[in-house]
Swiss-Prot record:
Its cofactor is Mg(2+); Mn(2+). Mg(2+) 1 binds at D100, D102. This is Poly(A) polymerase. Changing N189A: Slightly reduced rate of adenylyltransfer. GO terms for biological process: mRNA 3'-end processing; sno(s)RNA 3'-end processing; termination of RNA polymerase II transcription, poly(A)-coupled. It comes from the Eukaryota. The gene is PAP1. Belongs to the poly(A) polymerase family. PANTHER family: POLY A POLYMERASE (PTHR10682), POLYNUCLEOTIDE ADENYLYLTRANSFERASE (PTHR10682:SF10). It comes from Saccharomyces cerevisiae (strain ATCC 204508 / S288c) (Baker's yeast). Component of the cleavage and polyadenylation factor (CPF) complex, which is composed of PTI1, SYC1, SSU72, GLC7, MPE1, REF2, PFS2, PTA1, YSH1/BRR5, SWD2, CFT2/YDH1, YTH1, CFT1/YHH1, FIP1 and PAP1. Interacts with FIR1 and RRP6. Mg(2+) 2 binds at D100, D102, D154.
Amino acid sequence: MSSQKVFGITGPVSTVGATAAENKLNDSLIQELKKEGSFETEQETANRVQVLKILQELAQRFVYEVSKKKNMSDGMARDAGGKIFTYGSYRLGVHGPGSDIDTLVVVPKHVTREDFFTVFDSLLRERKELDEIAPVPDAFVPIIKIKFSGISIDLICARLDQPQVPLSLTLSDKNLLRNLDEKDLRALNGTRVTDEILELVPKPNVFRIALRAIKLWAQRRAVYANIFGFPGGVAWAMLVARICQLYPNACSAVILNRFFIILSEWNWPQPVILKPIEDGPLQVRVWNPKIYAQDRSHRMPVITPAYPSMCATHNITESTKKVILQEFVRGVQITNDIFSNKKSWANLFEKNDFFFRYKFYLEITAYTRGSDEQHLKWSGLVESKVRLLVMKLEVLAGIKIAHPFTKPFESSYCCPTEDDYEMIQDKYGSHKTETALNALKLVTDENKEEESIKDAPKAYLSTMYIGLDFNIENKKEKVDIHIPCTEFVNLCRSFNEDYGDHKVFNLALRFVKGYDLPDEVFDENEKRPSKKSKRKNLDARHETVKRSKSDAASGDNINGTTAAVDVN
């Protein structure tokens, strides 16, 4: 009788090992991942290790300096310690070239979050290796985003209720969570969840290859972005881990096929759980739909294994759920064809068709005439609220789906005058008018250090898109999207009084037809949609929203949304 360990909350579906044919397909999967650039070089890996070593030294120096300021002796200050942990894709071992490193700085109880954003921030700025830095202290999990020796790093901080943080510390003990506030709990949870996932899969190497493939697939198919209502990296990792538990002896190629089959047929909102949900020592909320109405509202719940268990997919909306399920069905069809030798793995990873899929798009552009750091904060806020706009749009009568794209489009221009800034806002975002921007200097990675550009005033732009599919039986019907769009603009403006300065921060929402999308959303080898010549000019049938005096003064533009959208 087999004594194989059982992983997960149920027994396996199958314990059969891989066949010769399946191993061959697995080899071809790995080759395709290499071809797609999923693996980094040994030198790139060594660079990451060196950067993390420097950050560990900085973490200890940070704790030491804060300790000395609080009148500790030199010996006590050194013993106070400080340690960094990684989490996310790097910790899981599935990072690729250019991936960021999610990094947690753990500090003792006398070091505060304010110290992190002052003392540690200053230590980072002293380093010659620092390329970029953007502190976001007001984020859900307060964060400092940096680029260090060319590597993007997201730094968060957690304070433990103990006087020392030695290098030997691990985070597995639930008692470490005592007496922490919610932000510290959330910060610690990333590393704790990542470590548990690795402990809960039968064969970590099989899991890693399968997860690399799913990450690549999800990015190519534009279903990878927690902020926009799709699963993020941790959620995709847990979904892959659950399939590995059900097929403990399968190779990665088989895991992929079963991944799409099982999840396309899953009885949502039945949760995906890697182990029984645990109680613990804290009076904190643990995911429980029997108690909490909010938990019952989760459409595709994927539950973190580390205490306190949370839903990693609470951001999924009705529209993004539809998109994800469509992609699961496509995955079933293609992987079945791969196993029948009718298609190759490259077919699975083909780019999405988002900008060809819909006739109508809502274009959301955040503008900043100021510093890059100002724009990162403003555009980051706008991005974080797009999901709320999606939820308001998808419940309108006549809208079948409001599908957010997962990647903002970033650009910046030299902008010497206010007239230039107004021109950018007026002409950007439409194929018909975007050539007017050629009169301004576009800032690129290649020219940004030139003296004439480096010191020039700049306008920064971040543009997001929502594809709209309408369900209108009466062709004379129109859909009014003005109210949710206006509420969205007002919400973004309300978060900080600085965002009321319309000479610096602006926000434009425009209703754009597929053939009028700007060139930047298409690859060079893609043929952009064209306007059908036989169709009547529908623009004349649009009832344009007239800007109120306050809107005109503010500089916000919601004209392009049109209050009554003609969807014919």
